[in-house]
């Protein structure tokens, strides 16, 4: 079957527009339509170009004609089947290298694949990214190796930026028991970060107030993410009201029994 490429011009609209232009109706075509006017029988002529292309193929094969003669076409030879509609073809993404940290996309030096509209209308004009050419890839690879060697300042990772943003909106609650004397330390705070907020925090990245915390109340703690950004998180030290260990449940039962037991009168 022979392939045939046909455009989408709208021949009837083009013929009608040409006639109106020949009659001097160019001003009428350029005049904007008022809101509320219902379109008439004749459709408006569009001056914009339609660049869509549809690739079709004949359903019936045209027989070969004799030498010097045109092939004889029947009505069945004007039946086509769709091969591809380039207007609705899936659009390819654009590969870029970020020059700065962009929220929800990446950090400097990351090779990202974004929509062409986002790259050409936002990232490239604002200088947030460059094209992923071989020269630019080599340049950022050298910069990355220098950062790993410690010759350049380190940058926060994408996961680190997400962690910093999350910690800025958090409040930590630390539950402490009332049956023993206690003093809050970084190990206890780190466990409550994972238990209550789901964030893994190393104890050496935590900083508590200089005065020892031995009572319930409102305090703060500072968390350093990847050694770059430090966030102060509000912290509430409250009474531990939901016992889970058998030892603490046994102690609570003993205290309740002592309060409920009748006291014998002294003689």
UniProtKB/Swiss-Prot annotation:
Stretch forming the transit peptide: 1-52
**Where does this one sit in the cell?**
Mitochondrion
Asked if Lipid biosynthesis is a keyword of the record, the answer is no
Q: Name one Pfam family in it.
A: Ribosomal_bL9m_C
Q: What cellular component terms from Gene Ontology apply here?
A: mitochondrial large ribosomal subunit; mitochondrion
> Where does the source fall among the domains of life?
Eukaryota
GO biological process terms, semicolon-separated: translation
Question: SUPFAM superfamilies, from UniProt?
Answer: L9 N-domain-like
User: What keywords are annotated for this sequence in UniProt?
Assistant: Mitochondrion, Ribonucleoprotein, Ribosomal protein, Transit peptide
This entry's Gene Ontology molecular function terms read:
structural constituent of ribosome
The principal location of this protein is: mitochondrion
- Quaternary structure per UniProt? Component of the mitochondrial ribosome large subunit (39S) which comprises a 16S rRNA and about 50 distinct proteins.
Q: Which family does it belong to?
A: Belongs to the bacterial ribosomal protein bL9 family.
Q: What is this protein called?
A: Large ribosomal subunit protein bL9m
**Species of the source:** Papio anubis (Olive baboon)
Gene designation per UniProt: MRPL9
